[in-house]
Amino acid sequence: MVTAFANAGYSAVLWIDPYPTRLPKLSDLKRLRNAKSVVAHSDERIELHRPAALPVEPLPLGSLLNQMLCWRPVRQRLREFAAGGHCVIGIGRPSALALWALKNLPHERSFADVLDNFPAFYRGVSRLSMKRRLKDVCRTVTDVFCSSNQLALDIQAVRHDAITVLNGYPTDHLPQPSIMATRKYVGYLGTIGEWFDWPLVCEIARALPEIPVRLVGPEFVPRPADLPPNIEFLGERPFNEMADFVRDFAVGLIPFKRNELTDSVDPIKFYEYRSLGVPVWSTDFGEMRLRDANDGVNKIQRGQDWRALWDEARVTVVEPHAIASFKEAVSWAKRGNVPGVVEG
């Protein structure tokens, strides 16, 4: 979406990286140990700024501490940027800094891009804090866009004019899909978190013992003790390698549990798989509830005939024109074309 803004005629885009908006947990130590350096955005039209912040925002004086100790440089840069002329403010993750920008920077228009049920990721005081920030942001901006129909329904309790703008994907420079005969993996691309249905994935692996089940992405929950030997872990990999991994998938998995967190999700991996002609096996959750075989999706649950599903996937042929049409429809050039906001 950021590149879509740059391509739409804006002379510059200032991207403020999200900072911690909840209290720290012990599992964060593992994230810090495994953290890899991120390459700065290569588009010279896009400026990246990573603000310093203490992980205390949910506390009564947390925002004040960050205002006093950490945010002077980012506030100054935001003021300079907004003073340059026609300015649109976009809010991804609700935060105290986002609210400060909405209230203090001159701008022509503003929008909230609600990608997830943010409070569902948090617990306790952090959850209450995020609920409040989300409501405040949605009431303050001029437009609210939600990445799934369920999110739009939920947010309409606060903003009746919230609309659904489904996720997009940068499809312009994707390679051509591979031929099915060269694909050998049941694959998953993405984070392995509390929403990941481990029992289902293990059942699939045991039913297809000669087929490698390849998992690509960071892990934030423990692995089961009795993992089948054909499950492979590749860990977190750079974004520019994702297409090459997906091209090796005979099937793309989206094995999510159905709960409060996933009920409003439109998974990016659906677009990644489909843009490269990969058949999708998905549980019935969130926006995936509205997709079926016409969308290249096979709904899965425990107890299915996995051998029959695998054999069916191996003979599935996705026509090149169907892939091209899908890629065009979900590109950010189409998805991000929101009148009055994206045009520079």
Where are the regions a protein language model picked out?
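A short, active-site helix/loop in glycosyltransferases that binds the activated sugar's phosphate group
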Residues: 121, 140-161, 289-291
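Carbohydrate-associated surface elements
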Residues: 150, 165-171, 177-182
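Conserved donor-binding/catalytic core segment of Leloir-type glycosyltransferases
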Residues: 179-196, 201-205, 214-216
